[in-house]
Amino acid sequence: MIVGLIGKIIKKEPTQLNVNVNGVIYEVFVSLNCSSKIVSDDVKLEITHIIREDAQSLYGFLDSNEKKLFDTVIKINGVGPKVALAICSTFTPTSFAQIVSSNDVSMLKRVPGIGPKGASRILVELSGFIIDSNDETSGSSSALEAALALESLGFKKDLVSSVLKTCVNSNTSDLVKEALKKLQK
């Protein structure tokens, strides 16, 4: 599996790059957001390598949160790489997380290839989608552990994620205690 590429861009289109890595040229599909952030010919991309019976495709990302969004969305039944890339092109990971948390079907229907049923399915499947912030890596892992603990106690994902956003503690056990107090009200 190819998980990353470092090389020079020899051809750039809005959603596709040809990247020369030590004499081997790779075709990499990128979102419009990713493409607009590329200012130099030298590029370092995180890659999702998808192997199908009839093709192998590389999808590149400058941002690990965008890669996480893509990887999460393509796991949903009925959503392929093209629609996942369209989601990444239409929304930043942060704005997508806000759309999911607010259950905004109309915003999600703006993505080419997503209708009302598809938008509803995506929102149901991804309730509780959280992106990692670069400066709070340990805090986000504690929040994830706390969320899993609370869900195992029977609380719903969307309720848990909304309560955890209001919590101020940083370690897992304190987060769980604080969230339980808020959930009991």
From Swiss-Prot:
Cellular compartment(s): Cytoplasm
UniProt-annotated stretches for the region Flexible linker: 134-137
Primary subcellular site in the record, as a coarse category: cytoplasm
Keywords in alphabetical order: Cytoplasm, DNA damage, DNA recombination, DNA repair, DNA-binding
Domain II: annotated segments: 63-134
Transmembrane segments: none
Region span, Domain I: 1-62
Record flagged with keyword Cytoplasm: yes
Biological-process GO terms, alphabetical: DNA recombination; DNA repair
Record has Cytoplasm as a keyword: yes
Taxonomy, superkingdom: Bacteria
GO molecular function: ATP binding; four-way junction DNA binding; four-way junction helicase activity
Location of the region described as Domain III in the Swiss-Prot/TrEMBL record: 138-185
Gene Ontology cellular-component annotations: cytoplasm; Holliday junction helicase complex; Holliday junction resolvase complex
Record's subunit section: Homotetramer. Forms an RuvA(8)-RuvB(12)-Holliday junction (HJ) complex. HJ DNA is sandwiched between 2 RuvA tetramers; dsDNA enters through RuvA and exits via RuvB. An RuvB hexamer assembles on each DNA strand where it exits the tetramer. Each RuvB hexamer is contacted by two RuvA subunits (via domain III) on 2 adjacent RuvB subunits; this complex drives branch migration. In the full resolvosome a probable DNA-RuvA(4)-RuvB(12)-RuvC(2) complex forms which resolves the HJ.
Described function: The RuvA-RuvB-RuvC complex processes Holliday junction (HJ) DNA during genetic recombination and DNA repair, while the RuvA-RuvB complex plays an important role in the rescue of blocked DNA replication forks via replication fork reversal (RFR). RuvA specifically binds to HJ cruciform DNA, conferring on it an open structure. The RuvB hexamer acts as an ATP-dependent pump, pulling dsDNA into and through the RuvAB complex. HJ branch migration allows RuvC to scan DNA until it finds its consensus sequence, where it cleaves and resolves the cruciform DNA.
Domain notes: Has three domains with a flexible linker between the domains II and III and assumes an 'L' shape. Domain III is highly mobile and contacts RuvB.
NCBIfam families listed in its UniProt record: ruvA
HAMAP family membership: DNA_HJ_migration_RuvA (MF_00031)
Family statement drawn from the similarity comment of this UniProt entry: Belongs to the RuvA family.
Protein name, as recorded: Holliday junction branch migration complex subunit RuvA
Lineage: Bacteria, Pseudomonadati, Campylobacterota, Epsilonproteobacteria, Campylobacterales
